[in-house]
Amino acid sequence: MPCLYICGECGAEHEIKPKEPVKCKDCTHRIMYKKRTDKMIQFEAR
C-alpha cells in the first residue's frame, strides 16, 4: 500500500511503495515527511 510523502527540500508530493528507496524523485533529497490524514481519528482511552 503506497503512502503519500512530502519532500523536505522542494515540497513535492510523491507516493512511496514498500521496498522503494526513500528519496525525492525530483531533487533526490532523502528527508521525506509523511502526509497527515484528513479524516478524524479517535482513540479509546483506558
Swiss-Prot record:
Stretches annotated zinc finger (C4-type): 7-27
Residues binding Zn(2+): C7, C10, C24, C27
Record flagged with keyword Zinc: yes
Keywords, comma-separated and alphabetical: DNA-directed RNA polymerase, Metal-binding, Nucleus, Transcription, Zinc, Zinc-finger
Pfam assignment, any one: Zn_ribbon_RPAB4
GO molecular function: DNA binding; DNA-directed RNA polymerase activity; zinc ion binding
Broad class of where this protein is predominantly found: nucleus
This protein's GO CC annotations: RNA polymerase I complex; RNA polymerase II, core complex; RNA polymerase III complex
Membrane-traversing stretches: none
GO-annotated biological processes: transcription by RNA polymerase I; transcription by RNA polymerase II; transcription by RNA polymerase III
Compartments where located: Nucleus
Task of the protein: DNA-dependent RNA polymerase catalyzes the transcription of DNA into RNA using the four ribonucleoside triphosphates as substrates. Common component of RNA polymerases I, II and III which synthesize ribosomal RNA precursors, mRNA precursors and many functional non-coding RNAs, and a small RNAs, such as 5S rRNA and tRNAs, respectively.
Membership in a protein family: Belongs to the archaeal Rpo12/eukaryotic RPC10 RNA polymerase subunit family.
Self-association state and partner proteins as the record states: Component of the RNA polymerase I (Pol I), RNA polymerase II (Pol II) and RNA polymerase III (Pol III) complexes consisting of at least 13, 12 and 17 subunits, respectively.
Entry protein name: DNA-directed RNA polymerases I, II, and III subunit rpabc4
